[in-house]
């Protein structure tokens, strides 16, 4: 049985030891194969601030807040995701006798994404097209390397960076990356560890929290 676990950057910052202990306990039972996919938004911001740089966020016309990942920010994302977070997770798991193997989605071209070279944002209530964007949308996951690692009793730990169609490193949404990994590997269980309360029917209405939902109901909401 295979479990794919997504770890959000906020949990790496706040509940690191508990997350590692839980993963180690599952791994040591030898009943499940595990794959971990992680993000690192807070750590990207932390590194930017250490460099006296401010994270760049914009509102989209649809009302969402989005990170603007320019050439400078993607360099920091590589350090935060592929360096700091990934190796910290691997180190902690190894200390718990978990044979973790860490890498990013661009290694081996495992996670493929379509780069968003420009994004439409609101600046002073005006629609502006921001170019030079180094984020992407996951479109495919190659499984050969992952299956090799799993077959040899390694636990893959994947940072949510991906390879664009032109070979550029792009920052991708960790949740989407993890879901694509789970689908590509035909995972039996997908677990998302996050610091949010759950799914909201209307995000602005805190009383609209959905505590339990089936896959069919979720598809209807996303339709």
Please place each PLM-identified region on the residue numbering.
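Nucleotide/pyrophosphate-binding catalytic subdomain
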Residues: 1-223
